[in-house]
Amino acid sequence: MPSGGGVMYYDGTYYWFGENKCDTTSSAMVGVMCYSSRNLTDWKNEGVALSVVDNDSSDIARGCILERPKVIYNAKTGKFVMWFHLELKGKGYAAARAGVAVSDTPAGPYRFIRSGRVNAGKLPVNMDGQAVAVLDTLNAKNYEKWWTPEWTDAVNKGLIVKRDLDGGQMSRDMTLYVDEDGKAYHIYSSEENLTLQIAELSDDYLSHTGNYVRVAPA
């Protein structure tokens, strides 16, 4: 089981989800595996929880990059929801998408729903009016050279948020969190892995609400 997997505890059993990878490629040739244990010592292979498919038109075509799978249980719907970092087949790490799948049982099988960037057209809720005014002045053409002090300052002010506003924010390494009130959150590296964003999920955990914050910009 590679690094980046996630453990869910449900009804007396721990379920461990992770990428299935081989020695010859970092691409997903099988999908997401699941193991179960009642004592965290003895583990049972539950098989493939989410399978990639032999269809190049699918977002989860065999050969895509599928990483960091995490599963949470939705008490309202009775469904198990998996989110993961997804890169489209043959596109390297350019897509920076979040994928979501759902199942009636902890170990699956999970049904893939969709993938995409996060919260297209939405600004962070912790970006106040003054910050938005500054954002409007940022022009990417003025910061074509990365890693300069000026570029770093512009990133802190939201240069990449603005760049990705229409298409949605990048989502790579990620986890999920369910609060005591049942509200769930998607926590992920964004903005070329230079910031952390925390995005609220819908009541069914299958989409984003548009509410998110930026944490610790570079």
Cite the ranges covered by each PLM segment.
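Carbohydrate-active catalytic/glycan-binding domains of CAZyme proteins
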Residues: M1-A218
